[in-house]
Amino acid sequence: MEDKYIGLALAMSSSLAIGTSFIITKKGLMDASARTGGTDGVQASDYLQNPIWWGGMITMAIGEIANFAAYTFAPAILVTPLGALSVIIGAVLAAIFLKERLGTLGKMGCAICLMGSVIIILHAPPDKEVQTVDEILGYATQPGFMFYCTVVTLYSLFMIYKIVPKYGNTNPMIYLSICSSVGSISVMSIKAFGIALKLTLGGNNQFTHVSTYLFLIVVALCIVTQMNYFNKALDQFDTSIVNPLYYVTFTTFTLAASFILFKGFNTSSAVDIISLLIGFLIIFSGVYLLNISRSESPMVDRDREIFGVHTSKDMAPLDNGVGGFSTVRRSMQINRTSEYDNEESVGLRRFDSFEIDSGDEDTRNYRH
């Protein structure tokens, strides 16, 4: 069997495990929060003692190991987009176990994601032949990729120390942008270390090369950072928001990193390149439909898109990396529009509790 199809099977298995792990982890965090009364947040001692949370972590570890192996056998341009399958699995399981809504648009989104995945599978090129891990180090030390790594490092440090403490609990993209940008470097390092293992098992020992250990250190640092901020996002925001956004941002950053590292997608066929781009757009569209279909209402979606406000748990992030849950929604401040005036006249209410602040003396509070 060709390496490409081995990687494909591993990637699909990985998506199944990771999609399931999102739900198990969320259930564990919810259970830990319930045990603490749901008001003071989830401390590390709470969720680390929760067997459900550990079940989610173990399932995710299995999925990540399969994903690790998939990058060894197949190119990132094939493996990464197939993460859409984990979004589909997460959506279906969230509807069943977390009682999150999956309507007609959600089902259409799932079907569209599958269609885009098939297109990518059919047109993904094979990986470049690599004889030693030092060859990948040579790619990684080229100016283009070094510049990319520098930008990611500076951006992540700025977000972690300046933005997260103040605004981390207001928008999931703050956490997920860190996860995704750092994750793109981890994928390249995982691929390098995986190839080193593959070559070593084939009789060409790569553990005599310093670069093998260098890639391993980068993998460890990046994964710790990813998991920390992914846990924060998952704890404070709905899975229907976190999963799709994480997929889109992680895929985009990873494909950009792969393109820069290997100076292209290892294909000269215009048909393949165009088909791959179309496949990505189709998957992104499906993920978007899946996201909006599981929101509370069209009005909430509109306000979220306009003002960048998402439903979050009413608790700032804690130092241990996992914030708390609350039964009270965060009130959203939005500018008054004539549409709300019309809705007021017929007695409609779109939110359980929110404030409308026009910024002048005509400030009103709406309560359900």
Swiss-Prot record:
Name of the molecule in the record: Probable magnesium transporter
Cytoplasmic side of membrane: 26-50, 98-101, 165-175, 228-240, 291-368
Molecular function via GO: magnesium ion transmembrane transporter activity
Gene ablation phenotype (knockout): Leads to sensitivity to both calcofluor white and Congo red.
Segments on the Extracellular side according to the record's topology features: 1-4, 72-76, 123-143, 197-206, 262-269
Cited function: Probably acts as a selective Mg(2+) transporter. Plays a role in cell wall integrity and in engulfment by host macrophages.
GO cellular component, one term: plasma membrane
Taxonomic source organism: Candida albicans (strain SC5314 / ATCC MYA-2876)
Keyword line: Cell membrane, Endosome, Glycoprotein, Ion transport, Magnesium, Membrane, Transmembrane, Transmembrane helix, Transport, Virulence
Residues with glycosylation annotation: N266
Subcellular location: Cell membrane; Early endosome
Keyword Secreted: no
Transmembrane intervals: 5-25, 51-71, 77-97, 102-122, 144-164, 176-196, 207-227, 241-261, 270-290
Catalysed reaction, written as an equation: Mg(2+)(in) = Mg(2+)(out)
Membrane topology, as annotated: Multi-pass membrane protein
Location, primary (coarse class): membrane
Family assignment from sequence similarity: Belongs to the NIPA family.
GO terms (BP aspect): magnesium ion transport
